């Protein structure tokens, strides 16, 4: 009996949390001699050295447009699944690919279709999210019932998928941080005179940064400081949040942090 051929599709993951998810998945494939792993990625430059047992196929053009992305998911993947005779197909970025395999899985992490309070200001501030709000629910629905399992990170998202798409195979898979803490020369707040609250998230409407700002306003005199991982230039929503916090000395905009910096900020926070 031949090996299982497991394809991990993540052509849209290039930076940040999603790219970390990809690396965590690839880490879990180590020492699985009964399987051959093939990863479909935007670029394998960083990954090949970290995961030499994985075969990488690059699709650098897919991320450039939704037309190319949909063609990839519904046409390219189907052809590839037949050529390589894949047994398992893992879609890491929301859309269930059109493939010919015995076992198919999808990881869904975009909550846009379930957003309940989208105001006119939200639409103007982040029009891309409004498009996600309108169309992502339709994209989720295509082929979703053909999956062996649908993975999400949170219990509330599981309930929404079960309700909206009548699914019984939704699995909550919470992130597991297996990365050790490392010293990178950052100055530590060892005196603990101030409380540090670290909120690492991209500036998107559904991340509710307004709640952080309101809390910071109330707690200005309590030595409680909030640290955010953007700088206000990323999009209109980021600019709005930055402006709301412009007079608050207990809100700190750190900008983008790499994985090591993130881990160390976690360690140094309360």
PLM regions: where:
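Short alpha-helical donor nucleotide-sugar binding micro-motif in glycosyltransferases
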Residues: 74, 264-269
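Active-site donor-binding segments of glycosyltransferases and PAPS-dependent sulfotransferases
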Residues: 7, 22-28, 32-95
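Conserved donor-binding/catalytic core segment of Leloir-type glycosyltransferases
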Residues: 7-8, 189-207, 213-216
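Nucleotide-activated donor-binding/catalytic signature segment of Leloir-type glycosyltransferases, i.e.
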Residues: 55, 239-260
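A structural motif in glycosyltransferase catalytic domains
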Residues: 21-22, 29, 197, 212-215, ...
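Donor nucleotide-sugar binding/catalytic pocket of nucleotide-sugar-dependent glycosyltransferases
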Residues: 144-183
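Glycosyltransferase donor-sugar binding loop
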Residues: 40-44, 225-239, 255-256
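Membrane-proximal helix-turn-helix segments that form the acceptor-binding/catalytic region
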Residues: 79, 128-150
């Amino acid at each position: 009996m031949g090996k299982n051929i497991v394809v991990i599709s993540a052509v849209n993951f290039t930076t940040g949390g999603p790219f970390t998810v990809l690396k965590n998945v690839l880490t879990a494939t180590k020492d699985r001699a009964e399987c051959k792993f093939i990863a479909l990625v935007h670029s394998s430059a960083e990954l090949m050295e970290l995961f030499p047992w994985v075969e990488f196929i690059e699709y650098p053009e897919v991320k450039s447009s939704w037309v190319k992305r949909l063609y990839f998911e519904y046409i390219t993947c189907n052809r590839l699944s037949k050529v390589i005779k894949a047994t398992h197909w893992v879609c890491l970025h929301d859309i269930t690919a059109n493939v010919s395999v015995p076992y198919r899985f999808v990881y869904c992490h975009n909550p846009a279709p379930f957003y309940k309070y989208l105001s006119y200001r939200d639409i103007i501030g982040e029009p891309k999210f409004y498009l996600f709000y309108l169309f992502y629910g339709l994209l989720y629905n295509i082929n979703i019932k053909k999956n062996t399992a649908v993975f999400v990170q949170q219990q509330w998202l599981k309930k929404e998928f079960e309700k909206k798409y009548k699914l019984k195979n939704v699995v909550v898979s919470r992130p597991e941080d297996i990365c050790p803490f490392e010293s990178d020369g950052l100055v530590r707040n060892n005196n603990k005179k101030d409380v540090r609250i670290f909120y690492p998230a991209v500036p998107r409407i559904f991340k509710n940064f307004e709640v952080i700002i309101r809390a910071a306003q109330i707690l200005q005199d309590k030595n409680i400081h909030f640290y955010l991982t953007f700088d206000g230039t990323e999009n209109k929503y980021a600019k709005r949040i930055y402006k709301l916090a412009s007079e608050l000395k207990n809100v700190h905009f750190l900008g983008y942090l790499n994985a090591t910096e993130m881990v160390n900020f976690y360690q140094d926070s309360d």
